[in-house]
């Protein structure tokens, strides 16, 4: 099946799929679950300038979102879990069996494997007796080689057991993680479920289909949307997508002016047809997270939205065009600006920068919409006031 869309229709489809235009598709606690289930996962990043990435993803599209809602779903209700997918991520706990192969790989490979293996039973015994523990509770201060830099043996062992699925995160205090035995928090039926994938290739295709649905549209090529999908570097993505298309799990989308076709999940065809029938959606204004699912694929962003975005957090200050933690601003069906909000002292959300895109005029309607979005973000961050730097006027 092939659908022919204009670029405007492609934008409309993506934005409605993500709940960023029209009446809210995702509301409250259930809305968080619904969006994460639709997306497969949302990416986690611990940096918190004005909310962590996962929180920013949700605040832009879930009506009534609060940070405690997400914490409760993760650490109280256990309907969501934080684990690897597209890097560190949050995904529905019911998907646990589908990651069996990833957990098994962490049992086969890993840095400082001998030291970690020797310490594992001691760590498990400590947690079994004392309950949720962090790396500082274990007294294993020997430094070992680890993924980002040398670290304490306690941290390396806890993280390995977590990667293997023997531990889960019980809760966090800031960036400090407390781990507990998985069997205390996840249903036995999930922990004991067999791997639903018949083989590695079936597993790869499951992940590829999931990532296509997460963004909404993808071409049969490598992109950051497929990070951490096994065999992405060996042409596996294209092969998987063509097989999924042949099986009717993907549909082809030809966008006006773009030679290479895109693909969408077959589950989303009703929305494509709604857009083709002429549906129009009420415009909204939203600040988009730097690792938001919608913008995982920068080529898609350029082709469909005519917008180029670089997260400048790792760019030296002297070389930045914008700011340390700058968020794209979506207004209606266009990315119209970039904004740098920072949660400061005294319950104030400070707007350190606002840069309108070329050709965008600072109309009263636009600037009022940006200000309302800033106030919503301030509220989510527990800030009572929004302040603009002198050079930033709204």
What are these regions (language model features)?
Residues 1-286, 292-293, 300, 307-311, ...:
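Long, low-complexity intrinsically disordered regions
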């Amino acid at each position: 099946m092939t659908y022919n869309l204009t670029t405007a229709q492609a934008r409309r489809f993506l934005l409605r799929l993500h709940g960023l235009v029209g009446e809210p598709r995702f509301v409250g606690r259930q809305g968080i679950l619904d969006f994460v289930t639709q997306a497969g996962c949302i990416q986690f990043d611990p940096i918190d300038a004005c909310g962590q990435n996962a929180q920013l993803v949700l605040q832009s599209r879930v009506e009534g979102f609060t940070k405690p809602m997400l914490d409760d779903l993760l650490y109280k209700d256990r309907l969501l879990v934080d684990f690897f997918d597209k890097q560190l991520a949050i995904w529905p706990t019911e998907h646990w069996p589908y990651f069996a192969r990833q957990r098994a790989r962490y049992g086969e490979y890993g840095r400082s494997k001998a030291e970690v293996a020797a310490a594992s039973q001691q760590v498990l015994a400590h947690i079994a007796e004392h309950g949720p523990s962090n790396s500082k509770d274990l007294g294993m201060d020997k430094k070992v080689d680890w993924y980002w830099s040398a670290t304490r043996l306690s941290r390396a062992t806890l993280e390995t057991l977590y990667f293997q699925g023997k531990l889960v995160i019980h809760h966090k205090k800031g960036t400090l993680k407390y781990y507990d035995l998985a069997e205390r928090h996840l249903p036995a039926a999930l922990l004991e479920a067999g791997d639903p994938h018949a083989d590695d290739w079936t597993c790869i295709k499951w992940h590829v289909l999931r990532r296509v649905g997460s963004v909404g549209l993808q071409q049969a090529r490598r992109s950051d949307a497929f990070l951490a999908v096994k065999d992405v570097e060996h042409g596996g993505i294209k092969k998987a997508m063509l097989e999924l298309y042949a099986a009717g799990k993907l549909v082809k989308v030809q966008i006006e002016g773009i030679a290479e076709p895109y693909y969408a999940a077959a589950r989303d065809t009703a929305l494509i047809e709604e857009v083709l029938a002429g549906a129009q959606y009420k415009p909204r204004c939203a600040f988009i997270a730097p690792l938001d699912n919608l913008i995982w694929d920068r080529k898609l962003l350029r082709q469909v939205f005519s917008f180029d975005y670089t997260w400048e957090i790792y760019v030296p200050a002297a070389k930045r065009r914008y700011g340390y933690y700058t968020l794209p601003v979506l207004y209606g069906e266009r990315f119209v600006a970039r904004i740098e909000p920072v949660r400061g002292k005294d319950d104030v959300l400070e707007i350190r920068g606002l840069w309108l895109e070329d050709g965008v005029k600072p109309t009263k309607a636009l600037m009022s919409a940006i200000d309302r979005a800033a106030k919503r973000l301030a509220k989510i961050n527990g800030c009572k006031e929004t302040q603009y730097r002198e050079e930033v006027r709204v």
